[in-house]
Amino acid sequence: MSESKKMPAKKKTTRRNTKKEQQKKAATRKMIAFFVGLLLILFALARLGIVGVLLYNIVRLFVGSLAIVFLLLLAGLMIISVFRKQVLKENKRIIPAIILTFIGLMFVFQIRLHQGFNETFHLIWSDLMAGRVIHFVGSGVIGALITEPAKALFSVIGVYIIAAVLWLVAIYLMIPGLFPKMREDLHQRLAKWKEKHAEKVEAKKAAKALAELEKKQAVAEREELPEAAENSLFTSAPTEIPINIPEAPFEENETESPVLAEVPLDDEPVNFSNTNNYNGNYKLPTIDLLAEVPVKNQSGERENVRKNIGILEETFKSFGIGANVESAVVGPSITKYEIKLATGTKVSRVVNLSDDLALALAAKDIRIEAPIPGKSLVGVEIPNAEVAMVGFREMWEAGKTNPSKLLEIPLGKSLDGGIRTFDLTRMPHLLVAGSTGSGKSVAVNGIITSILMKALPSQVKFLMVDPKMVELSVYNDIPHLLIPVVTNPRKASRALQKVVDQMEERYELFSRYGVRNIAGYNEKVQRYNAESDEKMLELPLIVVIVDELADLMMVASKEVEDAIIRLGQKARAAGIHMILATQRPSVDVISGLIKANVPSRIAFAVSSGTDSRTILDTNGAEKLLGRGDMLFKPIDENHPIRLQGAFLSDDDVESVVTFIKDQSEAQYDESFDPGEVDESQVGTGASNTGSGDPLFEEARNMVIMAQKASTAQLQRALKVGFNRASDLMNELEAQGIVGPAKGTTPRKVLVSPDGEFIGGVEE
């Protein structure tokens, strides 16, 4: 019995000891698990050995490149749960706030990756199998699973908004009193603003009431005055009328224009051009005639820009070039990335990487501007995914050209969105070249339309040469034309020579009146007309437009080149300006002499760097995209400027031309008429020589009747170029009609007017 009584006592003691031991064992296991977990986290964070890299990649599989953040948060929560458990019990919102913040980060990291679920898993799995950590993998498999549906439903911007909302909610959970405090501050500021606004309104009401009171007092005092005083008040009232004149400045022009219109009628014996007759009723074309081109939203390019910045920096780094993208400017057709190079990097190394950068960016073509003028940066111009068309109406409205500058023309939109204009009077001549379909003809039509929308027919005249017969024929019969559009290349050289003769006549006129240019002459005419009853007409500006220079150079190269060179050298002061366009920019068309006298150039897309150097003296045009993409090199710039030309449809041109034709008829100037040209007169680029020249008999008779002979005399009388006149003179000498040349004196004529041979040639 004693043994049976002792046994239960031993069992009770054993049960009591087992509970304590279990608690100790549980605490021990918990601490062991804590330290083992913390040790594994440290191995994973430091990527120590194969185990550390493996653990880190396993975490990356689920949360991607946020593995470091996840492991640090996990370690922090473990430490708090073991040593500061009370903190989590008192602040139950901390864990939900951390989870929301982490989910927002997962959205952002996965969007930055620009990859889907399969690509993300492949990148992580390749690193896991290779035992390395190389690629940026977004937010892992979990991030891809939650981001891809959100991106499909709400777009990229929507995902960013969701992430921002999650972060705001997390901030609210962690700092509950923050938003109420902000709301109170906002209410206080609104209350202060309302008080100030109410005070201003009350002050205005008080001032208005005071003004009405003073007005009533003035009326009461006026009623008490005698009639004489009342009459005196009414007589002085008209002195306030001139104050309103500056508010309507256009009324002055409307009153002056009929006077200008009546000038030729008062002075009928003077047989001047009648261009001023319709200036009084002539109205300039309005912007409403042009169609609006919808403005394209380019916000979608931002994502491409961010992606390209990373590719550019990585590509430069792979070639051993230290470079950082300072800024990116999105233009209508291209985006320009401004890149800062590391000190000591040669610019030539960057220029030579053009093809490699195009390959990395998967771009059609890129242009490198090294360096950017005025900056210590290199520009890399990359085509946009979609081109934003620039409308001519939009450019005209934004350009805001000076109405007094008749030849100031909006040309195109620059990279920063600004409108670039140029004044043809300062150029003073312009060469436009580019391959077929590059936008050359649209640019020429834009220049002509810009002038037509600003200038009266008496202010600007055109002489147009269009051997293709389809580009400029739409402008026939407008009152701004000197003669109908010249389509025969054989007549074009004569028409250009007529312009040269007009230039010489203007210089003789300037010399007679003691002025230096057309502006001084017209100013003198204005003063004379203001002081005298007899009226003189101002000289108009003349714009010569040749749409296809190559065709003219094939038919009569010497005569055309001579006329262009003479106009290029002297025509600016005479108010004559040229626009030469060609789609074949070769050296036999754009010769060195033509380039020297036409300093301002526009290059559209060409096929080779050789053509680009022919136009601009530098490479670059071969990298253009076409459809209005141009390089503009004015006379006052050393480097070409890239612009996107405006689109002007044929319907818009037709609308403007029809509006002008409906107002007045064309009145051509016969002095510019090239006349009829015999097909046998002009060879293939060189002047005719020998007795087969049809003008030989006319030259022979003219020399015999005048009894003096010189090449300049033949040029003026026969309206031919210098080479042809020289050949005629040599033939006259060979047939014994004139003597040999003796310096600058005219040659002696050896045949009398009666046909007798005089002879007497001095040795």
UniProtKB/Swiss-Prot annotation:
The UniProt record lists the FtsK domain at: 416-613
Cell cycle keyword on record: yes
Gene Ontology cellular component annotations, sorted alphabetically:
plasma membrane
Q: Which spans does this entry mark as compositional bias, Polar residues?
A: 681-691
Which family, according to UniProt? Belongs to the FtsK/SpoIIIE/SftA family.
The domain comment in this protein's record states: Consists of an N-terminal domain, which is sufficient for the localization to the septal ring and is required for cell division, followed by a linker domain, and a C-terminal domain, which forms the translocation motor involved in chromosome segregation. The C-terminal domain can be further subdivided into alpha, beta and gamma subdomains. The alpha and beta subdomains form the DNA pump, and the gamma subdomain is a regulatory subdomain.
User: What name goes with this protein?
Assistant: DNA translocase FtsK
Q: Give the organism the record lists.
A: Lactococcus lactis subsp. lactis (strain IL1403) (Streptococcus lactis)
